[in-house]
Amino acid sequence: KAASPSTRIWYGIFERAATYAGLDTLDAPAGWTKPSQEYLDNFTNEGADVTVALSDAALDAKRCAMRAHASQIWVADGTTTRTNPEAAVAALHEPEHVPGAYGLSNLLVMPLLRAEYFQLGQGEPADDLLGGL
């Protein structure tokens, strides 16, 4: 069933400026690299319609969710799993802004940011995810 025109659809995005800024505050773990601009520009978006700051509890929940998918995501915080038996640690130079890092199987480091970014895909604009509902 197709969504009605009034249905608001939000896409979770990687906001380009935030991603670049986050990468500037960390060093990749040994054996990992930072992604190239060309790579990042293929999937990041310029600007977000809504930014949601993550509380410490939400950030911890996000880390736990990432760790639960160890065959897909490797959190670079020194933890090990059967899938990723070698510890990977990213150097975090501004942990108050970028409290962690992770990578996929390509071992390209990505910043764990203190916000989630969304772009409106359909529906009336709003200044928050649930605005007007």
Role assignments for model-derived ranges:
Residues 1-133:
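Metal-dependent de-N-acetylase/amidase catalytic core
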